[in-house]
A protein has these predicted regions:
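Short, amphipathic alpha-helical "recognition" segments used to contact nucleic acids or chromatin
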Residues: 77-90
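Charged, often Cys/His-bearing segments associated with DNA-binding zinc-finger transcription factors
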Residues: 1-69, 123
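Short, well-ordered secondary-structure "scaffold" segments embedded in the functional core
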Residues: 92-287
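Generic hydrophobic, aliphatic-rich segments that mediate packing or membrane embedding
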Residues: 46-49, 53, 71, 79, ...
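Short, flexible loop/turn motifs enriched in small residues
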Residues: 47, 77-79, 187-191
Length: 287
């Protein structure tokens, strides 16, 4: 027994000094990214746009210096915003935590902080045009897009369409009908994301509350966008593709191929104005 006790008292080789990770400065980290042009690939925006966004959110994302005095120090607001943007771009939480040497648990907390800051910022909120001044401003953008010589789309304020956003198929405990999320058109599982944007790719209405099997017309209705569009004062309207029903406030293309000259011309300019929603989706999903 004494021998056994003595064995427990034998100390192992002395442990080395604890290595403390240092947190890299934001400006130091992004310098090579700016120089080689990969900053936008990483954060989905130019450095100047990042600074502008950070200036809007600074009071909400900057760290508490008193709470960050120990261990690796406080996480600077730029790192919080950067991690949030990387996560929103589809990167895993490990990639979001990589730069500032954050533990994954810390990274989750900082991404949540960044998301809350974005959602609480009034200047970033999706806003539907209501006043005459706002409507005229939106219409001016589409007049500019419609033609260099003759502004055909004089009173258009938006263009709408649907996008399938891929998700992991829910189980029966999460949704009573998991198969409803399968889109036969796209052959994948997702949610139907309805969006209306202006001529400058700014989203003015968005909703993602219907399963992927829902057609665009029904998803548009369940989002409440049909009532929203119909509430537009005359003569303003929105553009949509053939999946939506035609009304005085929702202009869709003429169906079929055997169209007369006037109908064909209308479809051309209607399609020209509707390009902005496709480009908006492209901006959303590109990396």
């Amino acid at each position: 027994m004494a021998t056994l006790a003595a064995g427990f008292l034998i100390l192992p080789t002395r442990r080395g000094e604890c290595t403390q990770r240092s947190r890299q400065e934001w400006e130091e980290m992004i310098k090579p990214l700016v120089e080689d042009g990969t900053f936008k690939t990483r954060y989905r925006m130019e450095p100047g746009e990042f600074k502008q966004l950070y200036s809007m959110l600074r009071n909400r994302v900057d760290g508490d210096v008193k709470k960050g005095l120990g261990h690796n120090g406080t996480v600077a607001g730029e790192w919080v915003l950067g991690a949030t943007l990387r996560w929103l771009a589809g990167h895993g939480i490990s990639a979001a935590a990589d730069g500032p040497n954050m533990a994954e648990s810390t990274a989750y907390a900082k991404v949540k902080k960044g998301l809350d800051a974005i959602n609480q910022c009034g200047r970033l909120r999706i806003k539907w045009p209501k006043t005459e001044r706002e409507l005229r401003k939106k219409a001016k953008g589409f007049r500019r897009r419609s033609s260099q010589l003759v502004p055909v789309l004089k009173h258009c304020v938006g263009a709408g369409d649907g996008l399938l956003v891929r998700i992991k198929k829910p189980n029966v405990n999460e949704h009573p009908c998991p198969d409803r999320f399968f889109s036969g058109h796209k052959m994948t599982v997702g949610m139907n994301y309805q969006v209306i944007c202006d001529a400058d790719y700014i989203v003015i209405a968005a909703c993602c509350n219907t399963p992927g099997s829902t057609n665009d017309r029904q998803a548009f209705k369940e989002a409440g966008f049909d009532n929203l569009v119909e509430s537009l004062p005359a003569p303003y309207y929105v553009l949509g593709d053939a999946a939506y029903g035609a009304t005085n406030k929702m202009l869709v293309p003429y169906p079929g191929c055997n169209l007369d000259a006037d109908q064909d011309a209308f479809n051309f300019f209607q399609s020209q104005g509707r390009m902005c929603i496709e480009q908006t989706f492209g901006i959303m999903v590109s990396e």
